[in-house]
Swiss-Prot record:
This is Acyl carrier protein. The modification O-(pantetheine 4'-phosphoryl)serine is found at residue 45. Belongs to the acyl carrier protein (ACP) family. GO terms for cellular component: cytosol; membrane. GO terms for biological process: lipid A biosynthetic process. It is found in: Cytoplasm. Gene3D superfamilies: ACP-like (1.10.1200.10). The keyword Cytoplasm applies. Residues 10-85 form the Carrier domain. HAMAP family: Acyl_carrier (MF_01217).
Length: 86
């Protein structure tokens, strides 16, 4: 029997993808770390604000508006969370 130990990055990635899928009403299977919120996932500005707020609550971090505007992809979110947790 083989067990896969998930790294912190893997756990964050999995959770962020779940949150994006839920907030944007999308199938998790279509969301990758390269997915762009507006262009690929058809999110509007309210969707992205709500997503950033949910991430702030989930991870206990603050995402200032000037930083939030730089977050365009799922991988941007993961990178931001990891930077704030270290």
């Amino acid at each position: 029997m083989e067990f896969k130990i998930m790294s912190t990055t893997d756990k964050i990635e999995q959770k962020v993808i779940e949150m994006v899928a839920e907030k944007l009403n999308k199938d998790k299977a279509i969301i990758t770390t390269d997915s762009r919120f507006i262009e690929d996932l058809k999110a509007d500005s309210l969707d992205t604000v709500e997503l950033m707020m949910a991430i702030e609550v989930e991870y206990g971090i603050d995402i200032p508006d000037d930083e939030a505007t730089k977050i365009k992809t799922v991988s941007d979110v993961i990178k931001y969370i990891k930077e704030r947790q270290s």
